[in-house]
């Protein structure tokens, strides 16, 4: 498990989130033959999000939500981890740098960058890597897994990347005045009822860069960086959570 996990109580809370993800079969039972639980596999890492094996800070300044971790073939081939030279990750790292984050090259674990990455669904698809993600899966995973993750991390900034990531973020943060379609929402931001800053951006994958061109994505992430740069420090909260004096 990545560091920055906090006190014993925090570790227990995080462990409960991991156990819930591994045990969940809601969408598998609703859509047999189209989606698989990663918890079926003995090599499934003890994480909430498989993306956090790159960026998984437990007191992040920013939580970013993408689409999925690929398909069952990708998951099994890489034993629950990302492969090097993943275009989505390479693009995302460049965008995070534009936002002012100094992050390791993926998939090397970065224990210091205050970023947590997750996806709109935590299971993996059967079929092709570009197979559709069903709206029902996103809604179910948002309610059962993303909502408690947000409650645990308490990120001051949350970013929905692409259509699925945006639908999940919009649902959990209840920014119902925001456009539902990512094509209308991308590039804009809102303040949730709990004062979380919510941003909608294009997905950093190859198709996402076609849908929202690279210069626009860079501009979007620079705006996110400006918002992050004026956040109040989280040191006091981090010290309290970790039990340090």
Task: Mark where each language-model region is.
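A polyanion-binding, active-site-adjacent surface
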Residues: 6-178, 196-209, 214-215
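Short, amphipathic alpha-helical "lid/cap" segments that border enzyme active or binding sites
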Residues: 143, 215-229
């Amino acid at each position: 498990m990545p560091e920055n996990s906090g006190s014993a109580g925090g570790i227990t809370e995080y462990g409960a989130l991991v156990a819930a993800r591994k045990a969940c079969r809601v969408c598998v039972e609703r859509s047999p033959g189209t989606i698989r639980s990663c918890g079926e596999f003995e090599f499934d890492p003890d994480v909430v999000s498989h993306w956090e094996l790159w960026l998984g800070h437990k007191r992040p300044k920013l939580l970013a939500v993408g689409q999925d971790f690929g398909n069952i073939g990708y998951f099994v081939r890489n034993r629950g981890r990302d492969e090097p030279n993943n275009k989505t990750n390479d693009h995302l790292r460049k965008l995070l740098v534009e936002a002012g984050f100094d992050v390791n090259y993926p998939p090397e674990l970065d224990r210091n960058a205050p970023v947590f990455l997750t996806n709109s669904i935590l299971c993996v698809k059967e079929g092709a890597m570009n197979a559709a993600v069903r709206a029902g899966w996103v809604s179910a995973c948002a309610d059962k897994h993303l909502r408690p993750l947000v409650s645990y991390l308490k990120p001051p900034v949350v970013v929905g990347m692409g259509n699925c990531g945006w639908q999940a973020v919009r649902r959990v943060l209840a920014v119902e005045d925001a456009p539902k379609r990512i094509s209308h929402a991308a590039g804009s931001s809102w303040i949730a009822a709990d004062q979380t800053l919510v941003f909608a951006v294009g997905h950093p994958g190859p198709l996402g860069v076609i849908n929202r061109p690279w210069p626009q994505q860079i501009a979007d992430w620079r705006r996110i960086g400006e918002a992050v740069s004026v956040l109040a420090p989280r040191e006091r909260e981090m010290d309290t959570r970790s039990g340090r004096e």
